Amino acid sequence: MVFASLSACGQEPDKRLHADGKGWRIEQAVVIDKKRPRVLLVGDSILNGYKNQVIKALEGKAYVDAWVNPYHQSEHLNDVLLPAILANGPYDVVHFNIGLHGWQEGRIKDGTFEPLTKGYVQAIRKALPKVRILWASSTPVTTKGKPAKLKLEPEINSVIVEHNRLAARVMVEMKVPVNDFYALLVDKLNLARGDRFHWTGPAYKLLGKKVTESVAHELKPHL
């Protein structure tokens, strides 16, 4: 696996939303067999928790790159940063999540969430006309504290729920299959870490299994 430091890896000024790992980065598999399909996983710090499981599960079947980034919906992301990452392909499957860095007031202007999210999907299809795309909803945001006493954080999580709803509507319109991370974990708050945004190993194992199964399904024509 090759680690690349690109401007596309970005910075996150909100210290609550740290990378939870080796930092914001793109990890690129070393491609030896050019006939083997390629996969790109896109996400925030949550991706750090499950990407290795997916990479291991698909070993020998597909090369898996991972872009761990702190971005939210924006024209700059769609027009500049995302195309720069996609140029590392070509990819046969792109599995993406974008959401935990867009809840702060002012980051995404009113009325722009859906068109920008649609533009994100369009940017992928423009760069990779034959690609299979999968979208994952954002995970729940909890209160801080011990796992046994955690609840949903009322203010931030309500924004996450609304953004998930709007994004899901875009995915229906764009005919993009959905991995509902939120639904998978919302009744398992005891698996949250207690820092509001991140999760424990068992939760990431559930996410990794879900991603592996869905990506493997989309790869069937290539295997």
Where are these predicted regions, by residue range?
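Loop/helix-junction capping segments adjacent to catalytic residues or to phosphate/diphosphate-binding pockets
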Residues: 48, 74-75, 205
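Active-site metal-binding loops of divalent metal-dependent hydrolases
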Residues: 44-45, 100
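Alpha-helical cap/lid subdomain in secreted, periplasmic
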Residues: 57-63, 78-223
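Active-site beta-strand/loop signature of hydrolases that rely on acidic residues for catalysis
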Residues: 42-43, 94
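Structural motif
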Residues: 24-26, 72-81
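Short, acidic/turn-prone active-site loops that include or flank metal/cofactor-
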Residues: 66-72
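N-terminal secretory targeting modules
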Residues: 1-40, 47-48, 52-63, 87-89, ...
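Short hydrophobic segments within beta-strands
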Residues: 41-42, 136
